[in-house]
Amino acid sequence: LAHVATSLELVATTTALEPALVLPALASPPADTLSLIERRRSVRAYADRSLTLGEVAGVLRRSHAREPSLSRATRTHVIANRVAGMAPGVYRYDPATGGLALSRAGAQGLESGRAGLDQDVVAGAALTVAVSFDRASLRVEGARAYRQAFIEAGIIGARLYLGAGAEGLGGCSVGAFYDEELAHLIYAGADLLV
């Protein structure tokens, strides 16, 4: 996440998003939150396999199971590289419907790795999640909106770890990336901050 002042140039265009698929309902029973917190770790070496659509649904639905606490300006983007039942591409997740709207088709592992400062942990991931902010929502939310959106993004990140753990998966938060490359990759446009 970065402030507009750190961006060299904003992406000039945005693309209307069409719903591509709706994620299945949670298949696994609720996990014990305290044990998930206790086991929570960053994982930088991943199994060489595709994720299932059910696993992706579990991670995303759990990470957005509650309404935003501080800010409604956050937007969640999914870069799917190896997910069975899901075409490779960049999607925007709608927590209200559980839907994913395709914003860029095709495998984006190399591009996401480049955007993530050429880190293999990003390029080799079956799935990468990025959080951006909607500028219009930030303006509406007032003076503390920018700060609160960062806190909300952190809450989403923590819940992503717990959602991954509940699905028997691992993940690694990466806060180092190139603003412009990530903005272009997720088609952030002039209305979103990455």
For every predicted segment, state its role.
Residues 1-153, 167, 175-194:
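N-terminal accessory segments that position/regulate proteins before the catalytic core
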Residues 170:
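Residue-level detector of anion-binding/catalytic polar loops
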